[in-house]
Curated annotation (Swiss-Prot):
This is Type I restriction enzyme StySJI methylase subunit. The keyword DNA-binding applies. Residues 405-444 are annotated as: Disordered. One of its GO terms (molecular function) is DNA binding. The subtype gamma methyltransferase (M) subunit of a type I restriction enzyme. The M and S subunits together form a methyltransferase (MTase) that methylates two adenine residues of the sequence 5'-GAGN(6)GTRC-3'. In the presence of the R subunit the complex can also act as an endonuclease, binding to the same target sequence but cutting the DNA some distance from this site. Whether the DNA is cut or modified depends on the methylation state of the target sequence. When the target site is unmodified, the DNA is cut. Residues 407-418 have a biased composition (Basic and acidic residues). It catalyses: a 2'-deoxyadenosine in DNA + S-adenosyl-L-methionine = an N(6)-methyl-2'-deoxyadenosine in DNA + S-adenosyl-L-homocysteine + H(+). Disulfide bonds: none annotated. Belongs to the N(4)/N(6)-methyltransferase family. InterPro entries: D12N6_MeTrfase_N, DNA_Adenine_Mtase, DNA_methylase_A-5, DNA_methylase_N6_adenine_CS, SAM-dependent_MTases_sf, T1MK-like_N_sf. Type I restriction and modification enzymes are complex, multifunctional systems which require ATP, S-adenosyl methionine and Mg(2+) as cofactors and, in addition to their endonucleolytic and methylase activities, are potent DNA-dependent ATPases. Its EC number is 2.1.1.72. One of its GO terms (biological process) is DNA restriction-modification system. The lineage of its organism: Bacteria, Pseudomonadati, Pseudomonadota, Gammaproteobacteria, Enterobacterales.
Length: 529
């Protein structure tokens, strides 16, 4: 049975548990605990991680209320285990399963699954790939909280492929989430080194314990990330409880992270509400994405490289935003911007980009002035499909960008303007600064170059650079007057409310419909003849 089949079967079981009040998110957390026990059993590593008496067979051998109570005790015991890594995985973990028969069903089901391929037991990476599949499923189903910003796997894979992490390089993700970037970086290094077998023992140990480090603010998400890393044989620094530390990047925890050769990250979107920015940055701001940008510049080794997913506002925000972009282009070689299509994150409408840069320059890693000369921009947003479940975003959509980016991880491969994938040549050209004195055919290309001087003089250091006209864009001059638009919107709302009222009464919820109507009357004032 392949991993996709295992994921499908395990997820199908979740539907049964949901009848008992177990949410998708809780189910994934529950599976994290059980998968850890099962992984240790299947890979022969129980003695390395688990105390005697608290292992898979000890759980499996019990049924009913006895099993339920043992499972609760097991979670408490492992949460206070002397091994810091095990303690971190099970810290403050409790089960959300309330019915003993559901736990018995889940344990029995997991135990009966075909965990083997032929005569060879599954490796930790096999478990890891399956677990990642479950995390992806959870993101697809919840579409809220962290799930709405779940970084698409094709994008992670492309970013890591272009950054090309090497053995003995430290890869950092200061907004780790479920550790997707770190897992992919590990996978890339293993693919280049015969699963680390080509490396000497000391370098192998470095890759397992020191090469990958993340920081995550949310305890529950950090636990999922730790589990993900462990299942992919990334143990991290055992003294710090694994590869993923718990803490705030925008506070002292971020300052204490070791310097990195590579940063690949997708910082959380939105305002700074709920985020305690206690760290002193060169350019103080309440915009947490801009604070993350400053952290990344600071945390990179000279000559280090980064790829950062940022929302559009990072490219054009004034004031401190302008100062931070100038700082970025001064201290780093910002060589590439990828404008991402909308709809690839589960929070619909979020417009994002990837910034690729090197700290200093390749010829002088310690250079901290005038490091940026030309910035190349690939527009994968304008006139692209509306991505979602019916039109998934795949590696094929990123392949043209990978081709023009080139093999050099610092963006120094020979490049030429001009790339017309996805019917770009049919696009209209926007009347903008970007297209002044530009050949008409070249202006329809998705791949353009803009000098640092042009960005300074024509854009006032804004990096919101676009030149293709979206075929679905609306000309503001042709819009009706605001009062007409408002009246149309109000009319549609009234019609929708009427249909909802009728539906509620059809469903036997007339009293609730009356209550809601009363609230509307109080809110707007009852209209009298």
């Amino acid at each position: 049975m392949n991993n996709n089949d295992l994921v499908a079967k395990l997820w199908k079981l979740c539907d049964n548990l949901r009848d008992g009040g177990v949410s998708y998110q809780n189910y994934v957390n529950e599976l994290a605990s059980l998968l850890f026990l099962k992984m240790c059993k299947e890979t022969g590593q129980e003695a390395d991680y688990l105390p005697e008496g608290y292992r898979w067979d000890d759980l499996k051998s019990r049924i009913g209320q006895d099993q339920m109570q043992f499972y609760r005790n097991l979670l408490v015991q492992l949460g206070s285990d002397e091994k810091k890594l095990v303690q971190a995985v099970f810290h403050n973990v409790s089960t959300t399963i309330e019915q003993p028969k559901q736990l018995t069903e889940l344990v029995s089901y997991m135990d009966a699954l075909d965990w083997y391929n032929g005569n060879h037991g599954k490796s930790r990476d096999d478990f890891g790939d399956m677990y990642e599949g479950l995390l992806q499923k959870n993101a697809n189903e919840t579409k809220s909280g962290a799930g709405q910003y779940f970084t698409p796997r094709p994008l992670i894979k492309t970013i890591i492929h272009l950054l090309k992490p090497q053995p003995r390089e430290v890869v950092q993700d200061p907004a780790a989430g479920t550790a997707g970037f770190l897992i992919e970086a590990d996978r890339y290094v293993k693919s280049q080194t015969n699963d680390l077998d080509d490396l000497d023992g000391d370098t192998q140990d470095f890759q397992i314990h020191r090469a990958f480090i993340g920081l995550e603010l949310v305890p529950g998400t950090r636990r999922l990330a730790l589990m993900n890393c462990l299942l992919h044989d990334i143990e991290g620094n055992l003294d710090h409880g694994g590869a993923i530390r718990l803490g705030n990047t925008l506070g002292s925890d971020g300052e204490n992270l070791p310097k990195a050769h590579i940063v690949a990250t997708n910082p959380p979107f939105g305002s700074a509400a709920g985020t305690n920015i206690t760290r002193t940055f060169v350019h103080p701001t309440s915009n947490k994405q801009l604070c993350f940008m400053q952290h990344i510049i600071e945390t990179l080794h000279p000559g280090g490289r980064a790829a950062v997913v940022v929302p559009d506002n990072v490219l054009f925000e004034g004031g401190k935003g302008t100062d931070i972009r100038r700082d970025l282009m001064d201290k780093c070689h910002l060589h590439t911007i990828l404008r991402l299509p909308t709809g690839i994150f589960y929070a619909q409408g979020v417009k994002t980009n990837v910034l690729f840069f090197t700290k200093g320059t390749v010829t002088n890693p310690h250079q901290d002035k005038n490091c940026t000369d030309d910035v190349w921009v690939y527009d994968l947003r304008t006139n692209m499909p509306s991505f979602g479940k019916r039109t998934p975003f795949t590696e094929q959509h990123l392949q043209p960008f990978e081709t023009v980016y080139g093999e050099d991880p610092h963006g120094l491969s020979p490049r030429e303007e001009g790339e017309w994938s996805f019917n770009a040549e049919e696009s209209e050209v926007a009347d903008s600064e970007e297209n002044k004195n530009t050949d008409q055919h070249q202006a329809t290309s998705r791949w353009r170059k803009f000098s640092r001087e042009w960005i300074r003089s024509a854009k006032s250091d804004s990096l919101d650079i676009s030149w293709l006209k979206d075929k679905d864009s609306i000309d503001a001059d042709s819009l009706p007057e605001p009062d007409v638009l408002a009246a149309e919107a109000m009319g549609e709302l009234v019609q929708a409310l009427g249909e909802l009222d009728a539906l509620m009464r059809e469903l036997g919820a007339g009293d609730e419909a009356d209550a809601q109507r009363q609230l509307l009357n109080e809110a707007f004032g009852e209209v009298k003849a």
